[in-house]
Amino acid sequence: VYRMPKMLTAKQYMEVMDQVRFNSGESGYDWKSIMGEDLYNSYMDGSNEGTNWVEAIRNKNAVTTSHSLNVTGGSDRSTFSMGAGYQYQDGVFGNVVKSDYRRFTFRINSEHVIYRTEKGMDVVKIGENVYYQHKQNQGIQIGGQYSNELSNMLRANPAIPMYNADGSYTKAEDLKNWVDNYNSYSVNPVYKMLNQQSGHNKSINQNLHATGYLEIQPIKNLVYRGQLNYYQGTSTWRAFLPVFDANRTNADYYRTEDKATNNMSTSWGWSTTNTLSYKFDLQKKHNFDVLVGTEYSESRPDFGFSLNATSSNSVFGDMTHAYMSYMKNNNAASVTGTPCDDTRSMSYFGRVNYNFDEKYMLS
């Protein structure tokens, strides 16, 4: 991260909160009794600046790597291009939780002349484009202005320590004085993040796009193109919510029974595109390019479906085994499923391009 926000120290934070009270005609907080004398004194003498929560989840050594391999070749009648790529990225925020993205791609394109006249005009051509993508992602919550982990860290109290003296995270029992005497929503945001979906989630997506086409040119510059498009995609998402106790005043800050969620969806579809184009000129100055076409696509309920399942009380209590088969309460599991939408569409389109002596253009 090139530029990090400058955060308040614990001492500055306490001064600001006291000033808010003073402006309302109230006395300042009794910080010493809230946090304990030793911690209070370390803030006051500057030996301890408090917790920089944004820095706590910053991944200073985030790695990005990308590799690709491409091969091209052919002849005067056939050409091909093939390539594969791999990309990996560490999340710049996360640090204490796994946050990364990886993607593998493969593509192949080729075109072949089936019939060529003696004068060199390609009458019949066929070709295809195939693209496959595999993505895997796990990370922190990033959506919404307030419902994301960076926002939580920016708004968190720097006077609350992240760790106890023994190295364990501060939890509800350690923050009782904060909850009772300062703010009932006082929480260690890193400990909360560790026990939410931000720390325990994984998604895998696979997509295949394939196109095959036929081009016929019966006379020069009059080209018919028929194209068949196919798409197939699958996605899975798993999340595990462990037992934790960050603050008992908010239902989102503690959990007495772990929970796992499994989502999956699969779908496929197809479409056809047919176009007829013609290029011609008048008196070598008036140049025309005319195209007309149609496209049809459809999706049916039997082309795929989505499934969502949630259950509680895991046998192993970890993300590795966050599957429905490892949950003890499967008899009470919530399971929902929906088919793909039933849709069909037919479209007609056309285009005319004109230029005068390659100086003026109109479309």
Predicted region positions:
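Outer-membrane beta-barrel channels and translocator barrels
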Residues: 64, 75-76, 115-121, 217-219, ...
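Residues on the lipid-exposed face of transmembrane beta-strands in outer-membrane beta-barrel proteins
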Residues: 69-75, 108-112, 210-216, 274-278, ...
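Beta-strand-loop-alpha "switch" segments that mediate conformational coupling across diverse proteins
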Residues: 85
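Short Gly/Pro-enriched turn/cap motifs at secondary-structure boundaries
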Residues: 57-61, 340-341
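Active-site-proximal binding-pocket segments
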Residues: 362
